[in-house]
C-alpha cells in the first residue's frame, strides 16, 4: 500500500511532464505552420480559397528558391538596376518594411527554371490573375475589373487614404507594397499601390497585377520587366 501511495504522485508527475512536452511540441509546430516558407520550399501557410483558386494570403518573403538556391539581396539603387541575376530588395531599402509588406523581386526570379514559391505552388500566370478578376467583377474592360477592394486590407495603416472600396472580404490581405521602378526612377509607391508579378510574357513586356489606394479596381495588364514587384503564390 505504501509503495502504491508513493508511485501514484510520481505517475501523475510523469503524466504532467508528458503533457507539458506535448503542449510545447504543439506550440512549436503551430508557430512553424504560421510562418510562410522554409528554405526547402515546404508550404507552412497561410493560404485560403478565393473562388476556385487557393492563394497564399501574404506576400512572399523568402531569400531562396524552394530548392534552397540563394537569391541575392540588392542594397543600393545602382545594385538593383545593374542586377540581371535573381535579386530581392526591401521597399525603400528599409528592412522595417519587410514584416508587413514582404520583399520585392526582380524579373530574373520569375523568369527562372527554379521555383521561388513553395512546393505545389507557383507564381501566377496571366490566366490565374484573369480567373481572379472574373471572380471579383466579371469580364475585364481595358484590363480592369471593379472589385479590387475585396482584396485590399481595410483602413489606412497599410494603404494611403482613402483606400477606396477596401473590404478584404476575400481575406487576400493585399497591402500597399508598392514597387521598384525600372531605370533610375527607383519609385516605391509604398502604401499607394500594390504590384504583383505574373509569369506570362507578352511581346517584350510581362503581365502584372495592380491595386491602387484611390480606386476599387484590379488591373492586370502588360508592363516592363525591369521593375521590382511583390509575389503572391497560387496553388498548382
Task: Name these PLM-found stretches.
Residues 1-38:
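Bacterial Sec-dependent N-terminal signal peptides
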Residues 36-236:
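Conserved positions within compact, well-structured domain cores
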Amino acid at each position: 500500500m505504501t509503495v502504491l501511495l508513493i508511485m501514484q504522485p510520481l505517475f501523475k508527475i510523469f503524466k504532467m511532464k508528458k503533457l507539458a512536452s506535448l503542449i510545447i511540441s504543439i506550440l512549436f509546430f503551430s508557430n512553424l505552420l504560421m510562418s510562410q516558407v522554409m528554405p526547402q520550399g515546404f508550404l507552412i501557410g497561410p493560404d485560403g480559397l478565393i473562388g476556385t483558386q487557393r492563394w497564399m494570403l501574404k506576400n512572399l518573403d523568402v531569400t531562396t528558391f524552394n530548392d534552397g538556391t540563394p537569391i541575392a539581396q540588392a542594397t543600393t539603387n545602382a545594385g538593383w538596376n545593374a542586377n540581371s541575376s535573381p535579386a530581392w530588395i526591401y521597399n525603400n531599402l528599409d528592412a522595417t518594411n519587410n514584416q508587413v509588406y514582404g520583399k520585392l523581386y526582380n524579373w530574373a526570379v520569375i523568369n527562372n527554371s527554379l521555383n521561388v514559391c513553395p512546393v505545389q505552388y507557383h507564381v501566377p500566370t496571366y490566366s490565374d490573375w484573369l480567373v481572379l478578376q472574373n471572380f471579383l467583377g466579371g469580364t475585364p474592360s481595358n484590363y480592369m475589373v471593379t472589385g479590387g477592394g475585396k482584396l485590399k486590407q481595410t483602413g489606412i495603416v497599410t494603404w494611403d487614404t482613402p483606400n477606396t472600396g477596401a473590404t478584404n472580404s476575400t481575406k487576400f490581405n493585399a497591402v500597399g507594397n508598392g514597387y521598384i521602378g525600372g531605370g533610375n526612377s527607383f519609385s516605391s509607391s509604398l502604401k499607394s499601390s500594390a504590384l504583383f508579378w505574373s509569369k506570362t510574357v507578352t511581346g517584350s513586356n510581362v503581365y502584372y497585377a495592380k491595386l491602387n489606394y484611390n480606386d476599387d479596381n484590379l488591373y492586370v495588364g502588360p508592363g516592363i520587366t525591369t521593375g521590382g514587384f511583390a509575389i503572391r503564390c497560387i496553388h498548382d
